[in-house]
Amino acid sequence: KSRSRGLGDVYKRQEYIQSKNIESHIKVVNKLLETGNAYKCYCSSDEIEEQKLRAKQKKIPYIYNRKWRDKSEIEAPQDVKPVIRFKSKIEGSTKINDLVQGDIEIENNTIEDFIILRRDGTPTYNLSASVDDHIMDMTHIIRGDDHKINTFKQIQIYEALQWEKPLFAHIPLIHTLEGKKLSKRDNASTIDDYEKIGIMPDALRNYLMRLGWSYKDKEIFSLEESIKYFNLEGIGKSPSKLDMSRILSMNEYYIKNKSNDDLFQSFEEYCKNFKENINNEKLNIIKKSLTFLKNKAKTMEDIYNNSKFIINDEIIIEKAEMSLLTENAKNIIKSFMKKVNEIEVFNKETLEPIINNLISENQTNFKGVGQPLRIILTGSKFGPGIYDIIISLGKKRVLDRLSKVG
């Protein structure tokens, strides 16, 4: 579900759980046994390990020696539970008419008689995937090009059962900028990783679609445009490199161009899932302040961090920032508080003259007044514009925070 949410949750069919369809898988195994397209293998684990060791010593790929392929059940050892192996073709070749890679062919004698049912009675991936795809009337099987050997095996299963084969497309794997395959050890290798830092579904979908595929000079695609223009034939054969800086740029575009109402809804969900539950009063302030909070934000996490001065009741000022609060700066703050107390209307039009007068009276510049205010109100000398900060917090909270710095 998180993967679906992370890409926008546009999939409308019910989730399919392979393990719940084991009975159908086993029926197909029995059918393959009945038609002579599968057989029981009684080789022990030690025998298989010995075969693998010999192959390793000869420096050749391991292929099961098909010992039980043509043996009679009469020869079967007592009290040994067999595995079921698919009887792969030995003569000729198997071809994939791949929508991305073109025609790919392999000699059948290089495909082993692979296991389709384990000793414990559970079916293996290639059997289960073939059965499920057939039951669900899959027209296209799209997966990474590291699965080509599985496709050759599955094609033989389809042919043995006289099922109509789906179309296959093997897309290149995504690599790191260094040219290595993405792995779980990489910081951002799953959709969950991107969700946690606040990459928006539309941005991630748009970026992934453009990896190794293009349509004219167009960079930004809505969901509707993605469906309209995307085609498998346009995917390149070479691996694409995942560039986090481009993902962030794409996400920044979507943040800037999303309506504040839609963005706020996404932000609220992000906080609930990955940060904290924020009370309604503070959420309302954030919603009204989104126009400046999203400025320069590249992720939802950036917006969250920009909003911390609203979310946090206690502002922690680090030693480096505290050193900037000189006696002169504190006197400016006291004067600011006194003048703010005197105004009825609290907006930029009434605040601007106060700050301008303080600049003039103290023979300083805007930074000389704005920086100490920002530090006390947010805990940082960086952040949104000072008027945005002051107005979003409101008169009471501003005065409360300023009064805590002596």
Where are the model-predicted features located?
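Single conserved hydrophobic/aromatic residue that forms the stacking wall/gate
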Residues: 1-11
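Basic, alpha-helical terminal appendages of large translation-related enzymes
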Residues: 5, 14-16, 20-23, 27-49, ...
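Short, charged/polar micro-motifs that form catalytic or ligand-binding hotspots
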Residues: 144, 194, 359, 363
